[in-house]
């Protein structure tokens, strides 16, 4: 069994489209939707997610992430760093993904559906980052299947609305993480 940590740091978000700031109750909804997306993506594999911060594999949700590879101030949706044999850690940007969920929301989407979309976007970004952490030598990013967890960008409506599935990485995960039946 692999134990992995996933948790939210204190975050906030405000949008005119939403009619103001998200509430503490909505943050809890977002976290629950994100965790559901995360556990659902790894169903059948011997991996267990908790909010422990001291585990070998961990991804946290932070207010924002900056791309440290460039000198100008620019945000990124997520990042991770892994060392084969030692695990790794990643981060997911709440403000980047929440803003994108609002931007990709279909016309007429109500507040509750956008709040759920924020949770899905965050959970799906965490799924992608955990794939990088669990398979540090594998080429995870894919440009061919926009409906997969492996897709290289969170700048797409599918990240927040609709269903995602595993593509070519699922068999690699099965090799790395035994299934629950084994």
What are the roles of these predicted feature ranges?
Residues 1-34:
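Fold-level signature of zinc-dependent metallopeptidase catalytic domains
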Residues 2, 61, 149-152:
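Hydrophobic side chains in beta-strands
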Residues 9-14, 25-26, 37, 64, ...:
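Glutamate identity and glutamate-enriched acidic tracts
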Residues 10, 39, 46, 54, ...:
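Generic intrinsically disordered, low-complexity segments enriched for polar/acidic and small residues
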Residues 21-141:
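Metzincin-family zinc-dependent endopeptidase catalytic domain
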Residues 114-182:
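The catalytic-center signature of Zn2+-dependent metalloproteases
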